[in-house]
Regions:
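Radical SAM enzyme core and accessory elements
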Residues: 277-369
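Structured core elements
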Residues: 15, 51-54, 60-63, 68-76, ...
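Acidic, low-complexity intrinsically disordered segments
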Residues: 1-86, 91-95, 99, 319-338, ...
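Conserved SAM/AdoMet-binding glycine-rich loop
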Residues: 102-242
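Short glycine/threonine-rich loop-to-helix capping motif typified by GTGT followed
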Residues: 125-132, 157, 217-225, 253-264, ...
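Glycine- and acidic
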Residues: 66-70, 82-91, 112-118, 175-182, ...
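Glycine-rich beta-alpha loop elements in corrinoid/cobalamin-binding modules
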Residues: 1-34, 255-304, 312-314
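A glycine-rich phosphate-binding loop feature that marks nucleotide/adenosyl-phosphate handling sites
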Residues: 6-18, 120-125, 147-151, 214, ...
Length: 369
């Protein structure tokens, strides 16, 4: 095993943790790494993504997505939401040639031709007019994992209507235009309402909305704006509305990797307010992410190898979180210093750390606009 790992360590894009040793300062922060490998390890990128579509070769009526071919429509994202790990970690953005992919799937599957398109956002450069005609001719149904408001043109509306997709998903993230701008999500509540009017007459039975709370610079007016936006959508759309409410968790390799996370008391109080207000709105379902699980995820997502002891603690989640006082204070409840060495800095994903810091600064400088 040791020889195999040693040989693997010379391969591009391979990081072997046991060959690197972190050196810590007295305050517990990482000073540097001593390593047998040349750090940082540069991430390898699949540049042949366009011509070689990736999709599930087997479909089954027993799978979660019953009788559906799942097609990876793109990797990474053309947008730069400042909180999003996927959009930064999987840069550069690469798209599948959907025309090639759909034609290939059409040859392989002769019946139940349903395609689930997995991608964080739809590329505006895709020729949906041509794809729409091919889908129609070959009786292929296609559904989208999520949509951005500015991507909903007439072709996609028609595809959605014919696919009989029952659930449509969008991510406003917040009800506040100011806070959305801070996140670099460049659409407004007005755009959201226009989107709702566009989908009003589609055959969908459920609109799913993703929101976060505990965001940097957030105040109580931002929390109230979530409820107000849901109320406005409810007044237009008579179908079921599902709300997914998540705690903001700062992620590595993003402009918000320096941010602190709010304490449990904050999340409990704000979650209860949102739950109470949404309960008053007819036909709206609230799905709340566990606060304890979010706190644990926050610790692990920006933690280091010293957290391995957590896996050895055989305790219920609530008791575990209660006992991790030092870990919470060190890993999530403090704002990181600009020049702090992060555990993940030994992996080069192709984005300059200075760029991420400047994006964070830009967010704070623009917040009053």
């Amino acid at each position: 095993k040791e020889k195999l790992l040693e040989k693997a360590s010379y391969l591009k894009g391979v990081y072997i943790p046991r060959f690197s040793k972190p050196i810590y300062n007295d305050d517990g922060k990482i000073l540097k790494y001593e390593s047998f490998q040349n750090l940082p390890i540069k991430k390898e990128i699949n540049n042949n993504f366009y011509q070689k579509p990736i999709f599930s070769p087997i479909i089954s009526p027993l799978s979660f997505f019953s009788n559906m071919v799942l097609l990876e429509g793109g990797r990474g994202c053309m947008y730069n939401c400042r909180f999003c790990l996927s959009g930064h970690f999987y840069k550069p953005y690469r798209k599948t040639d959907l025309s090639i992919a759909i034609k290939e799937i059409n040859k392989l599957f002769t019946s139940n031709k349903k395609i689930g398109l997995i991608l964080p956002s739809i590329d505006k450069s895709i020729s949906w007019d041509e794809i729409k005609e091919f889908l129609k001719e070959n009786e292929i149904l296609i559904s989208f994992s999520s949509l951005r408001l500015d991507q909903l043109d007439d072709n996609i509306l028609e595809i959605l209507n014919k696919s009989k997709q029952k659930t449509l998903t969008i991510a406003p993230e917040t009800g506040s235009d100011r806070l959305r701008k801070f996140l670099n999500k460049n659409f407004s509540n007005k755009d959201i309402i226009e989107f709702v009017y566009k989908i009003k007459n589609l055959s969908i039975s459920n609109l799913k909305l993703y929101f976060m709370y505990g965001l940097p610079t957030e105040d109580f007016n931002d929390i109230k704006s979530i409820v107000e936006l849901i109320k406005e959508i409810r007044s237009i759309l008579k179908t079921q509305i599902s709300i997914s409410l998540s705690c903001f968790i700062p992620k590595p390799h993003t402009p918000f990797q320096w941010e602190k996370m709010e304490r449990e008391e904050y999340f409990i109080k704000k979650q209860e307010y949102i739950r109470r207000e949404i309960f008053k709105i007819e036909n709206v379902e609230l799905q709340k992410e566990s606060i304890e699980l979010s706190i644990l995820q926050g610790i692990i997502s920006r933690g280091d190898r010293r957290l391995s002891k957590i896996w050895k603690m055989n305790k219920p989640l609530k008791r575990l979180i209660k006992n991790l006082i030092e870990e919470k204070n060190f890993y999530i409840f403090r704002e990181r210093e600009r020049d702090e060495f992060f555990p993940w800095d030994i992996i080069d994903i192709g984005i300059n750390k200075e760029y991420l810091w400047n994006e964070r600064e830009k967010a704070y400088n623009e917040r009053g606009l």
